[in-house]
Regions:
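Amphipathic, well-ordered alpha-helical segments in soluble domains
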Residues: 32-35, 62-69
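Acidic, Ser/Thr/Gly/Pro-rich intrinsically disordered interaction regions
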Residues: 1-57, 75-175
């Protein structure tokens, strides 16, 4: 019999009780994070190409989609998920990245439908010196511009999810 890897979004094919089906997406996020970490390591040695950035974007897309999985598996957490995304700029920005790479025009952004992913160069360093000219991601925040190192941004999103899952999703039921 062939090994089953998944495919039934939230159906019985996951082999998990409905309230635990978010775990399939969390495991996927962790696998994509490993790929993003490999890209980070590569960025210290050599210039990244478009396919490298595609992998980091795919990680962020899976990171945002975790929200849907948690909400569908544990509807009672919707208000806490809303509060999490309202409190942390980075998670709203993660949503914008997810939707911005999926749709040509983002109609209801969390922050900035026209965010930018770019490389910032220090002209006093060797041109293209790996690890010294970071890939940044920038979002408009009102009249201000918020810039993040791309890999620090991915770290923050992962840390926020890790904390939320430990504190709210996996925590014992409140009585």
């Amino acid at each position: 019999m062939p090994k089953w890897f998944g495919g039934a979004a939230l159906g019985s094919g996951l082999g998990l009780p409905p309230s635990d089906q978010w775990k399939a997406q969390w495991a996927r996020v962790k696998r994509w994070r490993v790929k993003a970490e490999r890209i980070r390591a590569k960025s210290m040695r050599e210039e990244l190409d478009a396919s490298d950035l595609d992998e980091v974007v795919a990680y962020l897309q899976n990171c945002y989609h975790l929200r849907d999985w948690v909400e569908a598996s544990r509807p009672e957490l919707k208000a806490l998920l809303d509060a999490l995304f309202q409190k942390h700029f980075e998670l709203g920005a993660c949503r914008d990245v997810c939707n911005g790479f999926k749709h040509k025009a983002v109609k209801r952004p969390s922050h900035d439908p026209d965010f930018n992913l770019y490389r910032e160069y220090d002209h006093f360093l060797e041109d293209g010196a790996p690890g010294r000219n970071p890939v940044l991601i920038a979002f408009a925040d009102g009249v201000n511009l918020r810039k993040f190192d791309l890999f620090e941004f991915t770290d923050t999103c992962f840390a926020l999810w890790t904390d939320f899952i430990a504190r709210e999703v996996e925590a014992p039921a409140r009585g």
